[in-house]
């Protein structure tokens, strides 16, 4: 019975963690699918989303700010004092963070990647690493080098209990929100006009241009959507772990990249599957082996997939004629 409860608890943790990995992994795969670039700056956009979210929460709920700016007092009481206020605050946090980080992604694409679009891939890769280091150190210098507490406005109350395993409201909110976003993105890509244009650009950029599709718009849209989803993951990550720091994006970013490769880089549904699988495997390893080995296992999975199935679980092998 204890073993079953342990497995169940780790599965719940794994699905929650996998939801975040899947959301971040989509940012990697949607960009790679269109421009064949591993956007290593994506992990820092994930981090930026957390800091933007914390800033919005501070403005909306800080009593210190309300004392300095009396016109903020009614809003502070509303957002901090009722369930409706908390829900509205979360929606504002997510919306502002998604817009800010999405625009950051568009700016990065315009000035760091677009000039290198016809250059060797290594040049764009080096540019991505440079942008990542710039964003990380910008937060280090301009905000703080210390961990900042990230309040959880949802609280730690239990949503329901399975056996002896309590499932918190926060975990339920994370899982449901991520699933809704994944379904919405899949529907957008497969059915909307812009989504079809992005798919056409991904399949054959030159042919799509000849058919009248705005290639630059499709690529820019990809660089908005991916970081925007990463911003949501950043906020949830802050609430889940209770703190954020300037270099918080590195490990989740690498693991999300592993999830994207596991599912099939460039395949949206593969990234979703890879994220959930990696989260579950990592949580089970933490419960049955040691928390110290969870990162080792994630990187071992990446190495094994690259060796034995580089196309990923849902990816396709491509043969190039020479």
Outline where the language-model segments fall.
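Membrane-interfacial amphipathic/re-entrant helices at transmembrane-helix boundaries
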Residues: 1-24, 52, 61, 65-92, ...
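Alpha-helical transmembrane segments within multi-pass membrane transporters and channels
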Residues: 66-131, 273-278, 282, 309-310
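Short loop segments and helix-boundary regions at transmembrane helix junctions
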Residues: 33-41, 90, 99-146, 188-193, ...
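Hydrophobic alpha-helical segments within and immediately flanking transmembrane helices
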Residues: 21-28, 41-79, 126-127, 229-237, ...
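Transmembrane alpha-helical segments in multi-pass inner-membrane proteins
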Residues: 21-23, 86, 90-98, 223-230, ...
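Transmembrane helix-bundle core of multi-pass membrane transporters
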Residues: 71-82, 115-116, 121-191, 218, ...
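Single transmembrane alpha-helix segments in multi-pass membrane proteins
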Residues: 7-59, 107-123, 262-268
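Helix-loop-helix "hairpin" substructures at the membrane interface of multi-pass membrane proteins
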Residues: 17, 166-244, 268-273
């Amino acid at each position: 019975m204890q073993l079953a409860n342990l497995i169940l608890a780790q599965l719940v943790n794994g699905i929650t963690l996998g939801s975040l990995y899947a959301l971040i992994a989509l940012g990697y795969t949607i960009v790679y699918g269109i421009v064949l670039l591993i956007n290593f700056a994506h992990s820092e956009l994930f981090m930026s989303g957390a800091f933007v979210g914390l800033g919005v929460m501070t403005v909306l709920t800080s009593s210190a700010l309300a004392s300095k700016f009396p016109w903020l007092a009614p809003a502070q009481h509303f957002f901090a004092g009722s369930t409706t206020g908390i829900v509205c605050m979360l929606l504002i946090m997510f919306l502002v963070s998604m817009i800010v980080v999405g625009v950051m992604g568009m700016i990065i694409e315009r000035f760091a990647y677009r000039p290198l679009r016809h250059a060797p891939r290594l040049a764009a890769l080096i540019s991505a690493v440079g942008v990542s280091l710039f964003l990380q150190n910008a937060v280090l210098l301009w905000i703080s080098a210390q961990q900042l507490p990230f309040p959880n406005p949802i609280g730690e109350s239990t949503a329901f209990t399975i056996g002896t395993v309590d499932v918190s409201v926060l975990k339920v909110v994370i899982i449901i929100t991520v699933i809704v976003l994944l379904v919405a993105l899949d529907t957008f890509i497969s059915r909307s006009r812009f989504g079809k244009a992005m798919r056409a650009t991904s399949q054959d950029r030159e042919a799509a241009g000849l058919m009248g599709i705005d290639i630059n718009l499709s690529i820019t849209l990809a660089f908005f959507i991916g970081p925007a989803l990463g911003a949501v993951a950043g906020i949830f990550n802050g609430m889940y772990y209770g703190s954020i720091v300037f270099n918080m994006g590195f490990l989740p970013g690498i693991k999300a990249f592993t999830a994207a490769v596991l599912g099939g880089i460039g395949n949206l549904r593969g990234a979703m599957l890879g994220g959930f699988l990696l989260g579950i495997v990592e949580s089970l390893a933490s419960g049955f082996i040691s928390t110290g080995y969870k990162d080792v296992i994630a990187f071992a999975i990446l190495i094994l997939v690259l060796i034995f199935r580089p196309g990923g679980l849902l990816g396709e092998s491509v043969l190039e004629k020479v």
